[in-house]
């Protein structure tokens, strides 16, 4: 499983990547496009059952499931037209199986926001719009080809043109491809959808990046998190609360130190563990 970590510049993508992989490889700087070429890291999936089995069999040999994370360059408006690092950004996402969308849910002027203020819904819509526009071009081109082939009497092409046009209309309304009512019983639809590799057809996990204080207070007092959580629920997606900076700070802690830290915070598991498991 390969997951792309995406989000607007300065929302905490590289900080989160550093914490996930327990490295300092991804330069986390306070300016856009700090991550230009994607950083890649492979991490094991936490599994208490595996630890228990190793204890029972008295062995140190464990082979956990692994997840590959890719830190992808920050996005700006116009990426679908090649603005900023748009072409590179979209190409990197296309190579991933799923998306971890990091959304800024913390206030503060020490870290600049490219739009000047914190608004997670606007930020999500900015990225979604660019991904949808990219998908729309792919679907429109294929629909046109199928419609042209259908004029020669190709019934299969005509059928494809019909559902592709419906998908084109769906995307044109600003909706993600993953919410399109695909006919799973139609092998041709399923195959073509897979061939197109649409960006918005990929599963998404929202990582709500907030302050350590908000995590300690139970997140109920953070309206930004509540907004993202509702949006994710409406989409049928997951929303994981996380403090990327704190996770980076404790990345090198021993298991015992992390356990003590979690107890002090009043939480059962780190946001990173929850994110990796959700992947």
Question: What is the predicted role of each segment?
Answer:
Residues 41-46, 73-83, 94-155, 170-186, ...:
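Conserved Switch II/interswitch segment of TRAFAC-class P-loop GTPases
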Residues 1-112, 139-141, 145-146:
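Conserved G1/Walker A P-loop phosphate-binding module
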Residues 33, 47-50, 63-69, 83-97, ...:
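Amphipathic alpha-helical transducer elements in NTP-driven molecular machines
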Residues 22, 29, 55-61, 84-85, ...:
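Residue-level detector of functional hotspots within protein domains
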Residues 2-6, 11, 17, 145-279:
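C-terminal-of-GTPase-core extension/linker across diverse P-loop GTPases
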Residues 15, 52, 126, 138, ...:
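Alpha-helical scaffold segments in soluble metabolic enzymes
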